[in-house]
Amino acid sequence: KIFDGNSKFDVSVVPTGNWRGMVMRTDTAPFDNPKVRKAVRLAVDRQELVDLVMGGAATVACDTPVAPSDQYRLDMKCPQDIKQAKKLLKEAGYPNGIEMVIHVSTKEPTWPTIGEVVQQQLAKAGIKAEVKMTPSKSYWKETWMKKPVAMTRWNERPADSALHEIYHSGAKWNESYFKNPDFDKNLSNARGELDFAKRKAAYQNAQKTLWEESGTMIP
């Protein structure tokens, strides 16, 4: 931004697959209910996060970890939908909303700001979120994959690696403890498929499943 308007510099913005997100453990109530998880994700205004946290220099991900430039990425629209979020919470048995604690740290400079913006957005859907700062030195050992809701970050990976390493039921770093047989099957089918169109369809079906049931909100 400091070079904008300066004729001495030619500024180019190149999309990458690096991302930050908020993880809900799918094995822990109330996030063990997919309707609750989707309600939380629907309550988030992703474009506002991109604008406020990244100064507009980011791409809305709609909860897929696949990079914007990846040939297997599924492009989706995911506008904030407070009405639907409230409806899903009611169907899940939480007509008055839920309470949650978002654990952040300065391990990643953007996490505290993401937490604060998400906190304000969730309130519109009746979700009361507390943002709790945790020690940076012990974040990966004592907070990540331990607390019900915590922040995460990943660098760009090929579609197959990103989907397997973060979401496959048997993956070591399945940080949201996500388990979905159809998702795993799509990944397996994609790896064994020689036809590009069919392989792409399998990877994109996996991403559709993440949009419906994922425990990870990727702005």
Predicted regions and their residues:
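A local structural motif
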Residues: 8, 95-102, 119-134, 198
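Residue-level signature of the cytosolic catalytic core of signaling kinases
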Residues: 32, 78-81, 179
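Structural transition elements
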Residues: 59-91, 108-113
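Periplasmic binding protein-like
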Residues: 114, 119-168
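Extracytoplasmic/peripheral linker and loop segments enriched in polar/acidic and small residues
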Residues: 35-38, 50, 124, 129-139, ...
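Alpha-helical secondary-structure segments
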Residues: 2-6, 17-61, 86-88, 98-111, ...
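Periplasmic-binding protein-like
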Residues: 13-24, 69, 171, 175-184
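Generic, well-ordered alpha-helical scaffold segments in large soluble proteins
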Residues: 39, 43, 52, 88, ...
